[in-house]
């Protein structure tokens, strides 16, 4: 009986303590999976030499697409994503980061694909390895749909998946 009262007291105390805990502001933590805040990518440079940070686009829906010309599926998807967004006039900014090691290959590919180069970037030097590792791209190139608050809505979408998702939103 003595132990029962003790466990009852401890149980009530724990319930009381847990009910008084406060939640954080409701913001997601930074990470690379849906529901997480997408980490900022800094010093992106396009073929004209313009630099920007991904956070400069906060307040807009963004599709971040990692790709390379030598990787046929990611290259094809890069073109198809651009076409879906442009042709359907979706309110989404596509930011593509290429991992081509040769800058001239990157530039020629953009020209051949007829994609607006303003938000097409190439990962250079230190950015190449840090982005490649951080986003675990050795397992394959990825893409992320990010909402206006920087939270990842979805990842690894096909162009058709993106089209269907944006029709709903």
What are these regions (language model features)?
Residues 66-67, 97-100, 123:
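Active-site-proximal beta-strand/loop segments in catalytic clefts of secreted hydrolases
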Residues 52-75:
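Short active-site neighborhood of thiol/selenol oxidoreductases, capturing the structured segment around
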Residues 140-169:
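Thiol-/selenol-based redox modules, centered on thioredoxin-like
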Residues 23-54:
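N-terminal "domain-start" segment that seeds a small globular fold
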Residues 63-64, 94, 143:
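Hydrophobic beta-strand anchors of alpha/beta hydrolase catalytic cores
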Residues 1-28:
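Bacterial Sec-dependent N-terminal signal peptides
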Residues 75-113, 127-132:
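Structural microenvironment flanking redox-active thiols in thiol-disulfide oxidoreductases
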Residues 107-148:
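Short, internal strand/loop/helix patches
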């Amino acid at each position: 009986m003595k132990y029962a009262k003790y466990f009852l007291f401890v149980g009530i105390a724990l319930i009381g303590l847990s009910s008084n805990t406060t939640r954080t502001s409701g913001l997601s933590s930074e990470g690379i999976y849906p529901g997480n805040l997408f980490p900022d990518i800094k010093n992106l440079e396009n073929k004209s030499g313009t630099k920007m940070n991904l956070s400069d686009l906060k307040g807009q829906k963004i599709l971040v697409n990692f790709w390379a010309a030598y990787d046929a599926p990611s290259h094809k998807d890069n073109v198809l994503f651009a076409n879906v967004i442009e042709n359907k006039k979706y309110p989404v900014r596509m930011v593509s980061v290429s991992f081509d090691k040769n800058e001239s290959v990157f530039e020629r590919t953009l020209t051949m694909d007829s994609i607006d180069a303003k938000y097409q970037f190439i990962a250079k030097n230190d950015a190449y390895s840090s982005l490649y590792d951080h986003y675990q791209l050795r397992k394959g190139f990825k893409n992320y749909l990010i909402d206006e608050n920087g939270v990842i809505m979805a990842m690894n979408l096909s162009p058709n998946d993106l089209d269907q998702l944006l029709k709903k939103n």
